[in-house]
Amino acid sequence: MSIRHFALAAIASAVFAGSAVAKDYELLNVSYDPTRELYQDYNAEFVNYWKKSHPDDKVDIKQSHGGSGKQARGVIDGLRADVVTLALAGDIDEIARLGKSLPENWQTRLPDASTPYTSTIVFLVRKGNPKGIKDWGDLTKEGVSVITPNPKTSGGARWNFLAAWAYGLKAGGGDEAKAKEYVQTLFKHVPILDTGARGSTITFVNNGQGDVLLAWENEAFLALKEDGGKDKFDIVVPSLSILAEPPVAVVDKNAEKKGNTEIATEYLKHLYSKEGQEIAAKNFYRPRDAEVAAKYEKQFPKLDLVTIDKDFGGWKTAQPKFFNDGGVFDQIYQAQ
């Protein structure tokens, strides 16, 4: 073998050996408030899945949780998320627009507009439903105290608000003035605005404040599942709610800098696998996979749902109209 051929063979051998070298990954998932349990379970499953094809790799997945809007602002301001799993597309749009850390067409990169599971908004009430709460109209009755987070910082709160608006609009015959009047009256019954959904759950469940919690469906089920929950609380399903679609995305700029693009991408893709969908369903999120959804069909109540795209023009319309400075929420809340 010539010196040249020997050198080329040595380089090829080194490249091949380098590709097989074990890697040490630390992945940061910046998520919204009530997904702690979901991703604790999913992270363990994903590490096992990854190690089947990368047995010598070390994978450490960190979680960060808080109100979705607050979390998005953190990523824009420099929190080095490899992936974001937030409450609504509008928050990831802001990361793309202001942070320039992923493309603005990020929702096209994964199935179902990058939303591997869905949820909705239900009511959690005290056991026996002492205030007789059956639907949105009951929330504005005298003496009823409602717990919901702040739409300025919480994605769940924005879903809550839009579900309430949809009810007010329907009850008012399509008149936006009547919908606005309804949500303004509703927020007069809200004594405290926590920054995130889990904070509101703690206020209601642990601190005993309020008669009804406007909750992510998964959060309401979790409250029943915890010790003694079924003896303390009931779930009330309203006549109308909203299809809550919490999306996921790789934060390209951060993942590339940390050498995590491949594993971060696979981390999100695996959410769509049978294993990922099972974990979502077991944590009370509605799975996208038809077979898994059929298996858990009895777990999830059927109800009429409005959608962000069809009924509100998408987040690019809904966010400025309702939640930006001077929007509908500011108008009705500051007027109190």
Stretches with model-predicted labels:
Residues 7-17:
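Bacterial N-terminal signal peptides
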Residues 18-22:
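Sec/Tat signal peptide C-region and signal peptidase I cleavage site
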Residues 23-154, 333-334:
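N-terminal segment of the mature folded domain
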Residues 30-32, 125-127, 145-172, 189-190, ...:
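Short beta-strand->loop
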Residues 120-129, 245-262, 279-283:
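A bilobed periplasmic-binding-protein/Venus flytrap-type ligand-binding module shared by bacterial periplasmic
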Residues 128-134, 153, 166-174, 254-262:
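Short helix-loop capping/hinge motifs at secondary-structure junctions, enriched
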Residues 171-239:
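Ligand-binding pocket segment of bilobal, Venus flytrap-like solute-binding proteins
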Residues 255-336:
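Extracellular/periplasmic juxtamembrane helices and adjacent flexible linkers that interface
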